[in-house]
């Protein structure tokens, strides 16, 4: 009677048996695998939220495979390979829960993941562009600036000579001066 209902404190409890391959050891503590955790978190979310979660999981899986995150933006073959590996892991986790409620969004989001996405804002922007009537942009495109420095544009529409960037406080920090300086 004195114990609050878990729903009141914002906790959702999902009880089920886990396949052994979806359990990992973290400092002696059994935890769900990255893929299973991502699938569980993405269930019942919006497509944008689900893709944010799956992009993050794909990056974690890439790092665990020894990939330097910087290379994901620069090496298209590596990026494709990491995406394929992440999708395989996530599909395996999805199959264990495919008959559960709220899994349709996971099935829709897995093909959209991109391990090179650097922030939730970038993931959300990519999904919004994909769901708009805009042509599909090239993603993470090297662009050489006037100084000769190479930058990587989040989105490029060559036919319009337009670059799209999805940057915010996650990249530049909360300090308004730093944000203004970086955006100049």
Task: Say what each PLM segment does.
Residues 1-102:
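Short gly/ser-rich loop at a beta-strand->alpha-helix junction or flexible surface loop bordering the NTP-binding
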Residues 45, 65-184:
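Surface segments flanking catalytic/ligand-binding clefts of nucleic-acid enzymes
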């Amino acid at each position: 009677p004195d114990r609050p209902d878990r729903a009141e404190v914002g906790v959702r409890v999902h009880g089920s048996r886990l396949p052994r391959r979806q359990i990992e050891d973290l400092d002696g503590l059994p935890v769900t695998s990255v893929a299973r955790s991502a699938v569980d978190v993405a269930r019942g979310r919006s497509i944008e939220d689900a893709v944010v979660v799956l992009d993050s999981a794909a990056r974690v899986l890439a790092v665990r495979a020894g990939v330097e995150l910087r290379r994901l933006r620069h090496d298209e073959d590596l990026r494709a390979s990491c995406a394929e590996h992440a999708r395989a892991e996530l599909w395996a986790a999805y199959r264990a829960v495919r008959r559960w409620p709220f899994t349709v969004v996971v099935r829709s989001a897995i093909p959209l993941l991109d391990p090179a996405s650097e922030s939730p804002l970038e993931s959300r922007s990519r999904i919004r562009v994909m769901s708009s009537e805009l042509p599909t942009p090239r993603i993470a495109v090297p662009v050489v600036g006037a100084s000769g420095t190479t930058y990587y544009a989040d989105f490029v529409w060559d036919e319009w000579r337009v670059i799209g960037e999805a940057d915010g406080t996650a990249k530049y920090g909360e300090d308004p001066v730093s944000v203004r300086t970086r955006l100049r």
